[in-house]
């Protein structure tokens, strides 16, 4: 089947993990307490605070206790949907104020633009909220890349390491899973996507491989497309050169 769409992870794939952990998370941790205090009465924020209480099992938690729970979740790198939503609100304010610019690897910018020009539909699947995803690409250091994407998916579609999530996403995209190529730097995510029927490509920007999947390393010693069993043809993604095959056979 022909590959018609690309579904990509963000952290470690299109963007540096360090941007998320060294820039975004600390920014949210610093600004989230005051943001929650100032906006707790607003409908959108109040709904997420209620979700924190429900998920933590502390139905009577006051605002300060909810803030403490959120900060604990940040420290634990917990993929809690209400936390991601609130972080997204904080980051949105930071992007609007010009304090944040989304990091996207220059090679990823090039590839995304070329893939779009070739008629491929591009989608994002990240543990970060859809709002946060849109901000990273829409307010990136390379400018507004938001128009390149046809849709975004987050943990509301399910955990990234469960195959049912990818089946659900394929259904939302409206394509057979075999016509979608998933890009990630996490082998468990690639496994789940493959189990759902998607094609997969692992990105190992620090070198190495992701067992069981075609892998693009930052310094390949030979044509990765040949090692992956694909025919000729490459599409440069900077130095790591991943290629989207015109046909999956």
Swiss-Prot record:
GO terms for molecular function: 2,3-diketo-5-methylthiopentyl-1-phosphate enolase activity; 2-hydroxy-3-keto-5-methylthiopentenyl-1-phosphate phosphatase activity; acireductone synthase activity; magnesium ion binding. Keywords: Amino-acid biosynthesis, Hydrolase, Magnesium, Metal-binding, Methionine biosynthesis. InterPro entries: Enolase-ppase_E1, HAD-like_sf, HAD_sf. It comes from the Bacteria. One of its GO terms (biological process) is L-methionine salvage from methylthioadenosine. SUPFAM superfamilies: HAD-like. Its cofactor is Mg(2+). Its EC number is 3.1.3.77. It catalyses: 5-methylsulfanyl-2,3-dioxopentyl phosphate + H2O = 1,2-dihydroxy-5-(methylsulfanyl)pent-1-en-3-one + phosphate. Belongs to the HAD-like hydrolase superfamily. MasA/MtnC family. Monomer. This is Enolase-phosphatase E1. It comes from Pseudomonas aeruginosa (strain ATCC 15692 / DSM 22644 / CIP 104116 / JCM 14847 / LMG 12228 / 1C / PRS 101 / PAO1).
């Amino acid at each position: 089947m022909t590959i018609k769409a690309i579904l990509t992870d963000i952290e470690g794939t299109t963007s540096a993990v360090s941007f998320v952990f060294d820039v975004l998370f600390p920014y949210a941790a610093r600004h989230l307490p005051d943001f929650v205090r100032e906006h707790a009465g607003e409908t959108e924020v109040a709904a997420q605070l209620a979700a924190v209480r429900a998920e933590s099992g502390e139905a009577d938690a006051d605002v300060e206790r909810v803030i403490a729970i959120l900060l604990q979740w940040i420290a634990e790198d917990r993929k809690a949907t209400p936390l991601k939503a609130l972080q997204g609100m904080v980051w949105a304010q930071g992007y609007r104020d010009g304090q944040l610019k989304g990091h996207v690897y220059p090679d990823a910018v090039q590839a995304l633009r070329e893939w779009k020009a070739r008629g491929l539909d591009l989608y994002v699947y990240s543990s970060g909220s859809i709002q946060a995803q849109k901000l990273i690409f829409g307010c990136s250091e390379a400018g507004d890349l938001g128009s390149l994407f046809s849709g975004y998916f987050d943990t509301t579609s399910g955990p990234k390491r469960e195959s049912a999530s990818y089946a659900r996403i394929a259904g939302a995209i409206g394509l057979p899973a075999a016509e979608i190529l998933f890009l990630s730097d996490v082998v468990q995510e690639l496994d789940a996507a493959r189990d759902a029927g998607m094609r997969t490509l692992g990105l190992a920007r620090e070198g190495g491989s992701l067992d069981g999947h075609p892998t693009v390393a930052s310094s390949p010693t030979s044509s990765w497309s040949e090692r992956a069993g694909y025919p000729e043809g490459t599409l440069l993604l900077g130095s790591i050169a991943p290629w989207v095959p015109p046909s999956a056979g």
